[in-house]
Amino acid sequence: MKPLIALVGRPNVGKSTLFNRILRERAAIVDSTPGVTRDRHISEGFWQGRAFRLMDTGGYAPEDGVISNAMLEQTMTAINDADIVVFVADARAGLSYDDLELAKVLRQRFSHKPVFFAVNKVESPQLAYEAASFVSTGYTEPWCISAKDGSGVADLLDAILLEMPESDADQEEDGAIRLAVVGRPNVGKSSFVNALLGNNRQIVSDIPGTTRDAIDTRFTRNQQDFLLIDTAGLRKRTKISAGIEYYSSLRSEKAIERCEVVMVMIDAGPGIEKQDLKIINMATERKRAVLLLVNKWDLIEKDSKTSKQYEDTLRSHMGNLAYVPVLFISALTKKNLYRAIDTAREIRDNRARKISTSALNRFLEEALAANPPSSKGGTELKIKYMTQIQAAWPVFAFFCNNPELVQTNFRKFLENRLREKFDLKGVTISLRFLQK
């Protein structure tokens, strides 16, 4: 993951203006009304060739009403998740009680994190002089900046760059298969993990959203190491409040980015819903392999045909995602728990497999014989050969006379045949057509 920089401070100190200045775009709403930024805003930025994620947060105002309390929770969670914190104050408004309180929290609870204290709106020598009063926060060397005109921002970013950690993408390449357990709240993710590991490692209750953090657990099965990431439930965006729940959802998305196989869990009772499909899409968009786990299967009245009928109904709702394998489990009775892990390992191994060019071209010859591509505009598509490109997921290159002649149905045909031929169920694959 790219390092995360969080902008925190009271409402209306200029965090959103600084956010936009750093990103050189108006990505956040800027308004003179305190507290306009109630939700988080996260975008990717670059400075001196280094990439990072920048987070704008709602204002820290602990003495105000319910909304501000949610914004306070948001600020605390943002600080906890961030690699670097930029604490923003307002030179025009002067030092406030809330500034002192936030400074106290940062020094006492987050002393292990790099904190840059930026006094914003310093747009005159007089304001620069008055900014000296902010040393009473305990930060004796505040950065005097103006997010509005950009003065001091480059120097601040240069200093931040020196504290910025390297991306941790390469730090997890230790041979362990990385699995993420994701799904809507209260579908049984933590019960699944606890049953699998044989301990009550997490609080399990009927209250949706009990698990707020993404929690990593290592275990070994059949001499293979696994890293299991259990996450907070992913709700619809419209149901995510302005506080801690959004950040729980953010952690789930981060877990998907970190893993190789996403185990999407649904509740057998209500079945698959739009949000489940969005979660699967989120995983496939990030080119992750996917396994669909139907939990609480023990609660379903069934006969010998039930699982087949249920799976058929699932796939009818999944459309282009119908290639995702389905496994019926019960965290309560431990039905198919280890089979889920073994299946995830098999999917991951297939995702990492390199298929020889000779095998691919034999496949291509058979596929073209079975379903020759139709012509387009009187011109016939001619595919000369194919190969697999080196990537973290299977990417297949087809060399042809004109890539624009490739029609959607034919592309889908090749994708389906590749999955069948080379056992790529659950694996996101990419097809690229290149002119030769």
Curated annotation (Swiss-Prot):
Entry keywords, A to Z:
GTP-binding, Nucleotide-binding, Repeat, Ribosome biogenesis
Q: Which GO terms describe its molecular function?
A: GTP binding
Indicate whether Nucleotide-binding appears among the record's keywords.
yes
Sites binding GTP 2 sit at 183-190, 230-234, 295-298
Enumerate the residues binding GTP 1. Answer: 9-16, 56-60, 120-123
- Domain (KH-like) ranges: 353-436
GO biological-process terms attached to the record? ribosome biogenesis
One Pfam family here: MMR_HSR1
EngA-type G domain location, by residue?
3-168, 177-352
> Is Transmembrane there in the keyword field?
no
Q: Which SUPFAM superfamilies match?
A: P-loop containing nucleoside triphosphate hydrolases (SSF52540)
The text of the family note is: Belongs to the TRAFAC class TrmE-Era-EngA-EngB-Septin-like GTPase superfamily. EngA (Der) GTPase family.
Q: Which HAMAP family match?
A: GTPase_Der (MF_00195)
Protein purpose: GTPase that plays an essential role in the late steps of ribosome biogenesis.
Assembly with partners or alone: Associates with the 50S ribosomal subunit.
Q: Which NCBIfam families is this protein grouped with?
A: GTPase_EngA, small_GTP
Protein's recorded name: GTPase Der
Name the species this protein comes from.
Chlorobium phaeovibrioides (strain DSM 265 / 1930) (Prosthecochloris vibrioformis (strain DSM 265))
